[in-house]
Amino acid sequence: MPARRATLAQPPARVELTFTERLEPAYSTVSVWNEAGTRVDLRDPALVAGNPRRLAVTLPPLPPGRYTVRFRVLSVDGHVVEADFPFTVTGPR
């Protein structure tokens, strides 16, 4: 959440990603960037309590605009996944 290429009327409070395997928290991260290339998340990526397959990061109130989620994770089976995807906020903070 949000979904890839989602258009949201309200900004999300956080980004939460779900993977098929358990993640190694020390080697897994997610961040959110604005159109100017500035990191906008609260720099607190962490596994979701009780679910080692979910990674989340908290967001401040975001103004309308296009954002990019970037992540790099290491699963316990040794696979590294690195990717990014955009989402757009159209509504108020």
Report the location of each language-model feature.
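Short, surface-exposed alpha-helix to beta-strand junction/turn motifs within ectodomains of secreted
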Residues: V15-L17, E21-R43
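Contiguous beta-strand segments within globular domains
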Residues: T7-L17
